[in-house]
Amino acid sequence: MDWIQTAGAGTQLPENNIKIAVFGIGGAGNNIIDDMLRMHPELQTANVQFFALNTDLQHLKTKRYVQNKAVIQFEESKGLGVGGDPQKGAVLAHHFLEQFHKLSDSFDFCILVAGFGKGTGTGATPVFSKFLSNKGVLNLSIVSYPAMCEGLKAREKAAKGLERLNQATDSFMLFRNDRCTDGIYQLANVAIVKTIKNIIELINLPLQQNIDFEDIRSFFKKPAQRLENEANLFRVTNTFTFSFDAHNTIEHFSHKLKNFEYEGFFDHKVEGAQKVILKVLVNQGLYPLDLTQIQEIIWAKIDNHNLEVQLGVDFTDANPSVQLFFLMEKKQAVSSDFIQKPAFISVKEVNQKPAKPFQVLNDLKELGLKYVKQQTGFNY
């Protein structure tokens, strides 16, 4: 056991060594993990490790920043991929379990990141998640769901994969590629990277009013015993962040949270959530915060009198901020109320009428060009 000396007290305390592993599974998962280490190399430490796993050796070799790489293969597969077949991905994952055990054995919390709709991520992620759950290792899956333009077949594969994943994982976050426009999926990667970074920091950076690892375990962990009517519910999580300054006031916070479903990449409404982790970083000299007012805004949005709240508070020299993690139980893996418009479109512009497939494709292209023009100033 590691010990730290307490100054002037002559006593020793055991050092907190929570170990976290982040596994990027399949092509999309590999891309996200590589992007994460490109943007935040400081996150990889002795206690936080990143892994890229893939059946496609050729793609795996293109990842420059992640150092821990492994090919999910078995004899005749030869690292050539699975041709978009989730069943083949699952079979190879089962053959890979002995190696996965060695990779994951020393970790307390595992985050699995994958794109659903093709072969490796869709097939292998539920296998690895179930293996971790059977060992009692806390695990969270962050997965993406295909956009309409990726085809109905991909969506069918993803939906079946989510059903298998829900039976295996403690909880999952679902990102919808529908929220991206004209195939600008790099925006999704950035959002997922930010989410993983926030989770790692929530665990590793102590607060004055702290949220300890057992608080986090109780938040994400699937109950050992569930009622019969709860057995098939999907345990999904969402996350929301907001930074305060002279131009981003408590009124703006309230507006953004009220319009959460229109301004985020993750699926599912948060009304009726059972649990919330609320992390507040305070700088009263820069922007005074009223915690009671913040909590009232959150409760009004969620509208659940039985809401469980884990509150963490600390001081910062930077802009004050709020981070929220929501946990809900839903009847569907993917919310039925499809929202076409991305975050840069105002709520008033959202068209609630169902669109024809070709209309959606044209809308996606138009909105993608509008976004690029807005971000770069370049006129097409």
Curated annotation (Swiss-Prot):
Gene3D superfamilies: Tubulin/FtsZ, GTPase domain. CDD domains: FtsZ_type1 (cd02201). Disulfide bonds: none annotated. It is found in: Cytoplasm. One of its GO terms (cellular component) is cell division site. GO terms for molecular function: GTP binding; GTPase activity. GO terms for biological process: division septum assembly; FtsZ-dependent cytokinesis; protein polymerization. InterPro entries: Cell_div_FtsZ (IPR000158), Cell_div_FtsZ_CS (IPR020805), FtsZ/CetZ (IPR045061), Tubulin/FtsZ_GTPase_sf (IPR036525), Tubulin_FtsZ_GTPase (IPR003008). Essential cell division protein that forms a contractile ring structure (Z ring) at the future cell division site. The regulation of the ring assembly controls the timing and the location of cell division. One of the functions of the FtsZ ring is to recruit other cell division proteins to the septum to produce a new cell wall between the dividing cells. Binds GTP and shows GTPase activity. Homodimer. Polymerizes to form a dynamic ring structure in a strictly GTP-dependent manner. Interacts directly with several other division proteins. Belongs to the FtsZ family. This is Cell division protein FtsZ.
